[in-house]
Design a protein with these regions (language model features):
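A generic structural signal for alpha->beta connector loops
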Residues: 49, 59, 106, 143-145
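Serine-hydrolase catalytic-loop signature spanning alpha/beta hydrolases and amidase-signature enzymes
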Residues: 84-87, 91-92, 109, 135
Length: 163
């Protein structure tokens, strides 16, 4: 009985999603990535207690959020953003970085803006996540000092990095 209920729920959700994504006006824009490209945000300005440092990598950029005074260098958080592997990092993730910093008693938070599909299909995002991890190693952190954090697609990347 539970299995059939899940199947019914699954069919309902799938049907609702198909109506939304197949809509002639919006569906094409979602599938092509046009809707995602038009989402423009102003640059995020960190609270006064933080430095936000941009880092250019070969194929992507990263931002390192750190306290201006007395950062906790014992650990670092590698935050991998969500977005279904199709969305760029959003300002909300820098807000999350500040929360991670607070909850970890001042640890730095590195947030890569990894390459996304459809322009950069798999394994581009994973390669960029791995490059971010290796960058932290090159800065003197050991693997056991790097805390992975991610939601949605970022959670998948975090799990893949652990493998």
């Amino acid at each position: 009985m539970i299995e059939s209920e899940a199947s019914v729920k699954g069919r309902v959700v799938a049907e609702m999603l198909s109506h939304f994504t197949n809509d002639l006006k919006i569906g094409k824009k979602i599938k092509s990535g046009e809707l995602r490209k038009r989402m423009i945000e102003p640059p995020w300005i960190p609270p006064a207690m933080f430095n936000l440092t941009g880092i250019n990598m070969d194929h992507f950029t990263m931002k390192l959020l750190s306290l201006k005074e007395n950062p906790n260098m014992d650990y670092v958080i590698l935050q991998l953003h969500g977005g279904g592997y199709t969305g760029a990092v959003r300002n909300a993730y820098y807000v999350f970085a500040g929360l991670y910093n607070e909850l970890s008693h001042g640890c730095n938070v590195l947030t890569p803006d990894y390459r996304v599909a459809p322009e950069n299909p798999y394994p581009a995002a994973l390669e960029d996540a791995l490059a971010s991890y290796r960058w932290l190693l090159s800065k003197g952190y050991y693997g056991e000092q790097i805390i992975l954090a991610g939601d949605s697609a970022g959670g998948g990347l975090a799990m893949a990095l652990c493998m």
